[in-house]
Structure formats: C-alpha cells, structure tokens
C-alpha cells in the first residue's frame, strides 16, 4: 500500500496528559485519535494490528471448539435485574433509557444476555458442553479514564461463555481456555503472566488474570523466584508466624497528639517505630459497622474483607458516619470504645502489647493499651496486603513484586447466573439442574497497548512480526529522481506478491521519512537511495538497528531469510 494513500497522521508532540508510553506512541505514530476522554478512534495502522490480533484469537478459540457469535451491546435492564447486578454493579455501568422510558445498559460484559439466549435452548446434558465467544466493543463509565487504551470508556473485548453439566467439564474448558490464552499472548508478542485473582463484580469461585508486565501497570503481581507461584496482590495470602514482642504490661495512658493524623506522623511524634502503632478503621458490612485493626506499616485489603465476610456489600465508613458513631475523626479512632461494635484484627496485631491507638477523641491517643484488659478482639484474620520480602503461602520463598496490565481473565462462574436466571437442563437422570458456567475475557484494545508497552524503544514502536500492520517498509528517498522512483516502483510490485508492503512514496525530506519509519516500527525496511542506479539498496532491521547494502538480485532471498528469522 502506498503511504501517500494511507491516513497516518504522525505527530511531533503529544499531549502532556499522555502518561503511558503506549498512549504517547499510539498517538504519535498516528494509530489512534482521541474523540473525548476515554474514547478513541482506531486509524488504519491500528485497525490492521487489531485485525491481526483478532485473527490469532479466533484461531485459538476455534482450536478449542469455541464458536463465534455476536450479541448486541445494548442490553435491557430486566436481564440485569434478574441477576441482581443492575443495582450491584455501581456507577461504572453505562445506563440509558429509550423514548418510552425503558432502561438499558451498554454492556461491559454479557453474562446475563448470553444466559438468556441459551436458557431455553440448551435443554439436555447431551447438548453440553457448549462454548460461545464474541469480539465486540464494551463500555464502562470510568471515573478517571487514563493511559489511553488501557483504561478507556469504550474498549474492544473478546468474551467467551461456556455451559456445562458438571464441574469436571467446566474444569476441562477452564484449562483449555487457560492454555489458549497463554498461546495467544505468546503469539502476539506479550510477556504475560497468569496470576490468581479476585473475581470482582463478575463473581465466581475461581479465577486467573493474565498480566502483561509493565512499569505503568495498575496492578501489582506477587510472585516467587523459586516456584510458579503468582497472584494479584489483592489475593496473595499473608503467612502468620507468631513473633511476640510482648513486654511488661503498662498502665493505659491518654496523651495529647496535636495535628497528628497518620500512623507515620504518630510514630514520629512518639519516637517509636511505625510497626508498633495500631491503626483502626471502620467499615460497614451489610449495613453493620465493624472495626478493623492493623499495624501501622500494614494496609487493609478490602478484597480479603469481602472474602472473609462472604459479601460484596462492604464499604469504608464515611467521615460523617464515623463522627456520628464515635465522636471523632478517622485519624483518632481506636478500639477502646463504650459502644457495641465488633472488632476484627489482623493476625499480626497479636504480636504486640502496650498498643498505641486512637482515643476516639480528636487530638488524643492512648498508649499502653492491651487486648483483654482494655478491649476484646472478636476475631483475628488475614486482612491486609502482603509486603515484599514476606513468606509466600506455598512455602517456596519470599514475595517479589512486579507491576502488570491485566490483558485477560478466566472465571469459573458456577451457577451464579443460571440459578438467578432459571437456566436449567435435564441431567442423565431426567432431573432439572442449573447450567454450570465459565466466562473468559481478553481485552483486545488493551492487548494492542500492552504490545506497544513491551515493544518499543526511544525512537518508536517495534512491532512483533505476528501483529505488525505491514511486513516491510519500502522507502524511496527522493521519488523525483527517476532511477530511485523506478526501482522503488519495481520492488513494490515484486515484494507485494509475498509481503504486506508499506511504500513511502511521499514527497517528503529523507529525515521525515526515516523518523516516521522508526516511529511506525515495521520489522524490516528497504531504502532506495543514491545507489539505485547500481541496483544497490539498504536493508535495515527495526529491532536490532542492523543494516546492510544488498544488490537487488539478492534482495528477495535476503528479505525472506530475515523475515523468517523475525520474532
């Protein structure tokens, strides 16, 4: 394709709000154009890359007998009310109503809709298992869209849904999808690591995320260097081994702590280590207030709280609620209280006595507070995030951290949707049973960004061979010169029969063409320049920067060999 005919609006400067390298490069190389916050158009080069990604996804889905369908993005509220998610999903669900006042949502996922499609069709165990997938735009009303395609309000996704008669069948499909996802990410050129994860708003009993390692990743991966252990930090268990630091019990004492609001400020004020401070936070669990205690250097993990209490209906109490409940602001909370409120403490609080806690009075704290004498803990548990260097739950070693971008996730849904939506089948005994389900998503547009995050240098994108928008970049340095133009035209005609060629025939300076070529990042470059009359051209590899002069008689052989050896 001639570059003069392709819409590639490269930029010299990008908006300052473009934080991620992938966002900057996709804008700069003319692949995407922002319409408004979190919403982008995919221009010709990006569309070609997306087509290559989706072709790989389709191949791998068909390999495991997953069948493609296409469902509407617009979903009626009644389906979401059946599952209970219309009220539970939160403000991220894009809602609208038609002229008749009927409520709809622009789907972020399609569990409800696909369940409604099959519930009166998959009637017998003989029709199972069945796996359906689609590739479609999804919508999420992000509070703060950022990082370009990585956190947008409209995004492209491959979502698949499987239906089963028993858990063994679900396990098999889950493993098939897990392996298919591993192959997909390897094929598109992403270093992605599967990690144990939380199922979030989708629900289910078991899930893995596929995380593309990246410095700008919004998720932290906890992993072992001695085993295959890997988990999202939200799910990483903290191993508690008692390490009591008990000293002689001292009398409780109330002290003034003016303008002290954080655990670190309190530690500095008292001249004590922050890990000897105990923080108190108040949560509402199914409408009931509770206190949760952790040591000063630890952070409460609300995902673990949801798992511990078996409910998603957990939220941090607001400042007004806290003041009404205890008479003090959040920085002064403590467990010594004359109100009926259950107290839960992280396991590691047990290692301390003579605690330092808030006095439930602004500007004051209590020192030498002791469990059993001054207050009681209802239950201890693992309520916090793991720290780097702590022991891992599989016994393999210590926790190491890496940042990652979630590009895919697989879920075992069980009967969460089929029970609430009455999707049943007849088993081999003729009894009605709820369909057992799995769901599996890949962020296609996120994958595009993740590829760029992991495959770029200071000059631009470096496309992996499998997804590159074109195989070769043919550049005529000066098309006004007959020998250069004629040779470039001849090479374009020859190589276009075997490769996808982007032919830069523009009337631009050589520097502009070379800068754009580096920015766009096609794997191989053929430059027709001053030695055209001798039949000599330059061949350059984008990844290594290696270049050599080649006679046109040998060019097809050289290019074919180099292309075959590309990753």
From Swiss-Prot:
SUPFAM superfamilies given in the database record: Class II aaRS ABD-related, Class II aaRS and biotin synthetases, YbaK/ProRS associated domain
One GO-annotated biological process of the protein: prolyl-tRNA aminoacylation
Cytoplasm listed as a keyword: yes
Superkingdom: Bacteria
Main localization category: cytoplasm
Subcellular location: Cytoplasm
UniProt keyword list: Aminoacyl-tRNA synthetase, ATP-binding, Cytoplasm, Ligase, Nucleotide-binding, Protein biosynthesis
Record-linked InterPro entries: aa-tRNA-synt_IIb (IPR002314), aa-tRNA-synth_II (IPR006195), aa-tRNA-synth_II/BPL/LPL (IPR045864), Anticodon-bd (IPR004154), Anticodon-bd_dom_sf (IPR036621), Pro-tRNA-ligase_IIa (IPR002316), Pro-tRNA-synth_IIa_bac-type (IPR004500), Pro-tRNA-Synthase_IIa_type1 (IPR023717)
Subunit description: Homodimer.
Comment field on protein domains: Consists of three domains: the N-terminal catalytic domain, the editing domain and the C-terminal anticodon-binding domain.
Family, as annotated: Belongs to the class-II aminoacyl-tRNA synthetase family. ProS type 1 subfamily.
Name the UniProt record assigns to this protein: Proline--tRNA ligase
Natural source organism: Staphylococcus aureus (strain MRSA252)
